[in-house]
């Protein structure tokens, strides 16, 4: 079987890692793995193809040339650009939603409208494309104010503003082009307090299976301070994700949204990620939808699961999925914590080119996996940072606390100039365990 993973980040390295791990037991034939564009981490597991993840025409041509059986699309941009549609039209099989269904992520305004029509709990909001009515709305809004670019902004398009004045300035800048096309439409939203939870579901458009939830750490600094990022760490399992809560998430979030997009003629196929705020009264409220696996959530979810999970992604793509079989293998084998190591200046102006000293895997131990994201090799073969989020360091353990210790100990041993990271990933779960 020939499989292509599209993307070059930590999520895609984790997907390649899982596919390679599962190859012997889950697939009935030999696995030939490709990544486009991949990174130095995927190069050890797959053949990297030097094709950008957004080069749809070239990716389709590569899928035909290499006789790819299944393409697993990692990032949001190629989904929004219609890569899954184009592959299917060319007679290839793809894991990922159509461009129309992927609007749940690529347009926050559309996502809000879908939730309104489906009766899904979410923060009150209003959408604007013109400055004057937007500023008038902000002027009477309760503080804090959440300002979101409607389009794709690499996880950095949502800003929690303490004051109306700050919100007005941020919204005006977005509308003026600070985030490019992503900010041409602005969503102004009420601020919700509670605890965030990342819940992902596999679906073929009709049936769904909820995966073990994770908790992301969006803020750059320890203690959840600083600007929003694409994610500075994550952990799994999460204590607040009880069976009863997940039953509510299924009934109140996933099922009505899937029905609504199907009714609009855009059935959703692939993985749907619900970024939730669990309110103090236990109500799950949707902050956002993503049309793909989360990053860095994937880097904890896949190592935590029993081997064999990736075959179920292939089964969905090939329209032969058995949800019951997926549900039966979803027990979390071990806790997992990933710590993201970012470049200095991230997220606004990350530095590039720092040389990375990465110990051999044997030195880090069997309970640590390092996933590459923003890395490359120079002309001499030296590993360097290409900016942004550079590495995800995943630790495994019988408890979240032990997994966090393994992750942090390994992160300490990885060196590059300007290394920026949080030493408190999973602090809520560790605090909960200590209070129990």
Predicted regions and their residues:
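ATP-binding N-terminal substructure of ATP-dependent carboxylate-amine bond-forming enzymes
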Residues: 1-100
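Solvent-exposed alpha-helices and their adjacent loops that cap or buttress functional pockets
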Residues: 26-27, 41-42, 65, 95, ...
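Short acidic-hydrophobic, aromatic-tinged amphipathic segments that line or gate anion-handling sites
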Residues: 48-55, 126-130, 161
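Internal nucleotide-binding/catalytic subdomain
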Residues: 157-302
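Active-site "cap" helix and flanking loop/linker of ATP-utilizing ligase/carboxylase catalytic domains
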Residues: 250-272, 290-367, 378
């Amino acid at each position: 079987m020939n499989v292509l993973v599209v993307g070059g980040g930590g999520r895609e390295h984790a997907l390649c890692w899982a596919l390679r791990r599962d190859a012997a037991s889950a697939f009935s034939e030999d696995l030939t793995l490709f990544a486009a564009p991949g990174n130095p981490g995927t190069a050890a597991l797959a053949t990297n193809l030097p094709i950008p993840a957004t080069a749809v025409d070239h990716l389709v041509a590569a899928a035909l040339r290499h006789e790819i059986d299944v393409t697993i699309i990692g990032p949001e941009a190629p989904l929004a650009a219609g890569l899954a549609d184009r592959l299917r039209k060319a007679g290839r099989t793809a894991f990922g939603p159509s461009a129309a269904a992927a609007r749940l992520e690529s347009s926050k305004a559309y996502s809000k409208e879908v939730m309104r029509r489906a009766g899904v709990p979410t923060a009150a909001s209003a959408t604007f494309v013109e400055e004057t009515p937007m500023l008038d709305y902000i002027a009477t809004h309760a503080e804090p104010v959440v300002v979101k670019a409607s389009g794709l902004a690499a996880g950095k398009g949502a800003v929690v503003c303490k004051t109306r004045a700050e919100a007005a300035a941020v919204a005006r800048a977005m509308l003026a082009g600070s985030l490019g096309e992503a900010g041409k439409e602005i969503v102004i939203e009420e601020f919700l307090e509670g605890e965030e939870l990342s819940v992902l579901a596999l679906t073929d458009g009709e049936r769904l299976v909820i995966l073990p939830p994770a908790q992301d750490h969006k803020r750059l600094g320890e203690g959840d301070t600083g600007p929003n990022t694409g994610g500075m760490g994550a952990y799994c399992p999460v204590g607040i994700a009880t069976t009863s809560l997940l039953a509510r998430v299924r009934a109140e979030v996933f099922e009505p949204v899937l029905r609504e997009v199907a009714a609009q003629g855009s059935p959703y196929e692939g993985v749907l990620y619900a970024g939730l705020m669990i309110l103090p009264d236990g109500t799950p409220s949707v902050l956002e939808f993503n049309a793909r696996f989360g990053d860095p959530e994937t880097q904890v979810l896949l190592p935590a699961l029993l081997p064999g999970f990736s075959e179920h992604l292939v089964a969905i793509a090939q329209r032969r999925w058995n949800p019951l079989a997926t549900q039966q293998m979803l027990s979390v084998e071990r806790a997992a914590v990933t710590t993201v190591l970012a470049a200095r200046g991230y997220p606004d102006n990350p530095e590039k080119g720092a040389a990375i000293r990465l110990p051999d895997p044997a030195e880090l131990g069997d309970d640590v996996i390092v996933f590459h994201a923003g890395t490359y090799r120079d002309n001499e073969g030296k590993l360097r940072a290409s900016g942004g989020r550079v590495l995800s360091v995943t630790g495994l353990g019988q408890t979240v606390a032990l997994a966090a210790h393994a992750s942090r100990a390994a992160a300490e041993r990885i060196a590059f100039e300007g290394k920026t990271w949080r030493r408190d990933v999973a602090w809520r779960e560790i605090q909960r365990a200590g209070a129990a």
